[in-house]
């Protein structure tokens, strides 16, 4: 696969497992020249589909409360050294209004896993944002929730949900999180 055309044909025909194996090979075993060729080809594809654009998102960190006590996280429940806050719906909407004036067309609402923001409360915020700014996307990143919750937030108008997970290794996950949290729960989200 010395030229981009044959590599392109291979990638278009390959399944996920084959792509994963190919990337693993290129990252771990391929010669520097082959890795460089792949990087050049990947950059050409990125430019073909996305151009030289930069996408800006308006990040609104609306709460630093979290019910979890993950060992690495500054928002962890047991961290008594931070001043906790929660933004009201009005404050969140004011952030969106300001961001809209500045040209943002995607708002990312991010928080710890804060039980105060029920589906109804968070859904109301999302609905209001979409009502005021119908040409904007809303992404939520509020930790693990139930399937019912994701569905309710989608129905309220959320366009995306960003669920962070730190690792796919059960052993490593156990070193980062207290026993009451489970990688299996996090992985189940991907089956939705």
PLM features per residue range, with description:
Residues 1-69:
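Flexible, acidic/Gly-rich N-terminal and inter-domain linker regions that tether
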Residues 38-78, 84-110, 159:
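N-terminal pre-triad scaffold of radical SAM enzymes
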Residues 14, 18, 32, 38, ...:
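Alpha-helical context
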Residues 77-92, 99-120, 128-192:
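Core AdoMet radical
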Residues 25-29, 44, 98, 128, ...:
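Residues within well-ordered alpha-helical secondary structure of globular protein domains
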């Amino acid at each position: 696969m010395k030229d981009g055309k044959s590599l392109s044909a291979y990638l278009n025909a390959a399944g996920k497992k084959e792509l994963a194996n190919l990337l693993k090979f290129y990252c771990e075993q391929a010669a520097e020249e082959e890795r460089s060729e792949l990087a050049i080809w990947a950059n050409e594809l990125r430019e073909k589909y996305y151009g030289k654009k930069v996408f800006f998102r308006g990040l609104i960190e609306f709460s630093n409360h979290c019910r979890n006590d993950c060992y690495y996280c500054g928002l962890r429940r047991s961290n008594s050294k931070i001043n906790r806050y929660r933004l009201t719906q009005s404050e969140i909407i004011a952030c969106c209004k300001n961001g809209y004036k500045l040209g943002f067309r995607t708002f990312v609402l991010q928080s710890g896993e804060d039980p105060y923001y029920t589906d109804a409360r968070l859904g109301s915020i999302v609905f209001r944002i979409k009502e005021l700014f119908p040409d904007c996307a809303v992404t939520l990143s509020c930790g693990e929730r139930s399937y019912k919750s994701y569905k309710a937030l989608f129905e309220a108008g959320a366009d995306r949900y960003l669920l962070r997970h730190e690792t796919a290794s059960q052993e490593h996950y156990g070193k980062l999180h207290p026993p009451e949290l489970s990688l299996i729960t996090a992985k189940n989200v991907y089956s939705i």
